[in-house]
UniProtKB/Swiss-Prot annotation:
One of its GO terms (cellular component) is mitochondrial inner membrane. Heme b b566 binds at residues 97, 196. It comes from Spermophilus major. This is Cytochrome b. The lineage of its organism: Eukaryota, Metazoa, Chordata, Craniata, Vertebrata. The gene is MT-CYB. It holds the Pfam family Cytochrom_B_C. Binds 2 heme b groups non-covalently. The cytochrome bc1 complex contains 11 subunits: 3 respiratory subunits (MT-CYB, CYC1 and UQCRFS1), 2 core proteins (UQCRC1 and UQCRC2) and 6 low-molecular weight proteins (UQCRH/QCR6, UQCRB/QCR7, UQCRQ/QCR8, UQCR10/QCR9, UQCR11/QCR10 and a cleavage product of UQCRFS1). This cytochrome bc1 complex then forms a dimer.
Length: 379
């Protein structure tokens, strides 16, 4: 009799995705982040669901409902801080996952890659709207500043902003719709993740060498299930250490002050995971130019398959490209730092130079270096 695992219409899909899936024998720990992102998504949906049971999306009661969750709900403080810091862990895993794809040339699976970029946009939108919900000072002013950027769109800008706000300023209508979108988007993300995996399993995983590994595959279970468990343990350990020892480490103290439209905080800045994009936005003195640079800073990822001029897929055997890649990583750290600084003399020029370098590396330097390496192969 054939195993139910292999014949049952529903179970066999799970079997082909997570159990009998042929996987390359040499994928490193950098391939753990896919499963860790899945875990982060599950944690966020579950903690978010329990928070939604106690949260009220009204300007008068939103801030106090979050306080109520932390003080009066059983383990409410734990659920709230797991959700807030879970978002940070989510983005750490996301950035490492995307960085892995860039380094090892995984973007040559362009359907998988492009859906991944759409997923990145969806997660960023979800995180932004979630940050508005506690209705603290930074929530309110962050929402005001970021939604206001849409007014830079010619002709329809102002109308569009007022349509999104549901009035002439960020108010109760904005908060209610942000809560609705923040609730629905993770489920859309789950659907996109399934499509992401569907396309990935059409081709199979890439591996560090970038070479075809069809001749040397091993079953996903038990080899990579046990390997993923190590990643899960490290992720949960890090998350719980953050939640239990310094839950407000990555937050902004201004968000413990209820939203007040009459008083602007001295420095409006987003959560740490948006700072690099915020720095690029601020580095351009023109409003529309800044908005375009902001959008293009993420959208540029979609160009990676087109900009790949090397004869080799992975950077494993390309020392010059490796060097440029790590300069790009350093540049992103610099942008993140600048995004959190006030708009003053040394920071403005550093931000502008770092922004130029970011686009130059991706659009010019990496493709040029790839071509040089192709020439060196002939020597």
């Amino acid at each position: 009799m054939t195993n139910t695992r292999k014949t049952h219409p529903l179970i066999k899909i799970i079997n082909h995705s997570f159990i009998d899936l042929p996987a390359p024998s040499n994928i490193s720990a950098w391939w753990n982040f896919g499963s860790l992102l899945g875990l982060c998504l599950i944690i966020q949906i579950l903690t978010g669901l329990f928070l939604a049971m106690h949260y009220t999306s009204d300007t008068m009661t939103a801030f106090s409902s979050v306080t109520h969750i932390c003080r009066d709900v059983n383990y409410g403080w734990l659920i709230r801080y797991m959700h807030a810091n879970g978002a940070s862990m989510f983005f750490i895993c996301l950035f490492l996952h995307v960085g892995r794809g860039m380094y090892y040339g995984s973007y040559t699976y362009f359907e998988t890659w492009n859906i991944g970029v759409i997923l990145l946009f969806a997660v960023m939108a979800t995180a932004f709207m979630g940050y508005v919900l506690p209705w603290g000072q930074m929530s309110f002013w962050g929402a005001t500043v970021i939604t206001n950027l849409l007014s830079a769109i010619p002709y329809i800008g102002t109308t569009l902003v007022e349509w999104i706000w549901g009035g002439f300023s960020v108010d109760x209508a904005t908060l209610t719709r942000f809560f609705a979108f923040h609730f629905i988007l993770p489920f859309i993300i789950v659907a996109l993740v399934m499509v992401h995996l569907l396309f990935l399993h059409e081709t199979g995983s890439n591996n560090p060498s970038g070479l075809i590994s069809d001749s040397d595959k091993i079953p996903f279970h038990p080899y990579y299930t046990i390997k993923d468990i190590l990643g899960v343990l490290l992720l949960v350990l890090t998350l719980m250490a953050l939640v239990l020892f310094s839950p407000d480490l990555l937050g902004d103290p201004d968000n413990y002050t209820p939203a007040n439209p009459l008083s602007t905080p001295p420095h409006i800045k987003p959560e740490w995971y948006f700072l690099f994009a915020y720095a690029i936005l601020r580095s351009i003195p023109n409003k529309l130019g800044g908005v375009l640079a902001l959008v293009f800073s993420i959208l540029i990822l979609m160009l990676f398959p087109l900009l790949h001029l090397s004869k080799q897929r992975s950077m494993m055997f390309r020392p010059l490209s490796q060097c440029v890649f790590w300069i790009l990583v350093a540049d992103l750290f610099t942008l993140t730092w600048i995004g959190g600084q006030p708009v003053e003399h040394p920071f403005i020029i550093i931000g502008q130079l770092a922004s130029i370098l970011y686009f130059a590396i991706i659009l010019l330097i990496l493709p040029t270096v790839s071509m040089i390496e192709n020439k060196l192969l002939k020597w």
